[in-house]
Amino acid sequence: MKMKTLKKTVVGLTAVALLGMGSAAVWAKDIKPRIIRFGYGLADDSPTGKASAHFAEVVSKLSDDKMKVKTFGNGALGPDEQLINSLISGSGEITFVSTAPIASLIPEFGVFDLPFLFDNEKVADAVLDGPEGKKLLDKLPAKGLIGLNYWENGFRNITNSRHEISKLDDIGGIKLRVMQNQVALSVFKGLGANAIPMPFTELFTALETKTVDGQENPLSTIQTSKFYEVQPYLTLSNHVYTPFVFLACKKWFDQLSQDEKDVIVQAAKDSQEFQRKARRQGNEDALKYLKEHNVKVAEFSTEEKEKIREKVAPIVEGLKAKIGKETVEGVLEAAKKASGA
């Protein structure tokens, strides 16, 4: 073979090789990212909706855009119960829900519906992020779920359309929407309310049509869900502290590579801090907003809170067996230690 021809052949082969390498690089770049469906019931502009968007951003960043979270807020994928079932079946990947519907699967989660469990957010954080909180999360895999961590739903407060509630007796006869679990039902029935379990996604319409008189939720939820439009009375009762459980589908999570699992776990941890801070600021902002929109605000006095505690004491004692005596006493002891009592 002549030298000139040989050079042409070498150049041609080199070009083909480079072209092949280029094609491989393009192919790698063009691989579709893993899409992760994340459904939730709250509004997208709520503090927790914003935290969900933050989670999506962190996942994209940590995975170098190889994992993409697609959020579906405002109950677009259904109520909490449906979201939980979608994770169990494998048709969804990520969600956050209140502990109340989880208690239908794992009764011990009902401990968070007991009244006046935590004095403040600091105590709640210590218990949830400590051994007692982990014990509960460790029960989830057996049900097809992974508990990544706890976010904050917050202290719940009562609104209604009938009259001011500032005393225990004022609760009597109020048709009050409660979360769908036995603990919430038992507590509010014990306080004299006509407690009606109902999915959150149906709540605004029920309030608007007077199917129910009132409801109980954290302040930022009351604002962002626009309950104040049909609920002129607010009571700062802080009667229950409710966490959100940040959940993943176990079937899906188990199929991830270790690197992908690390991304989800780290993004959940980062977003927990973001969410709690946003939620707490959101509650402060919400109270100011609600007052500016002519919502009449009342509070229980120390004496009235003590009456409520006394009223529900036998109910709580009776619920210990249903929830799990060991869980209730463990959480109460952890809360007492965290509060320095």
Describe the residue ranges of each PLM region.
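Sec/Tat signal peptide C-region and signal peptidase I cleavage site
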Residues: 21-28
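Bacterial N-terminal signal peptides
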Residues: 12-21
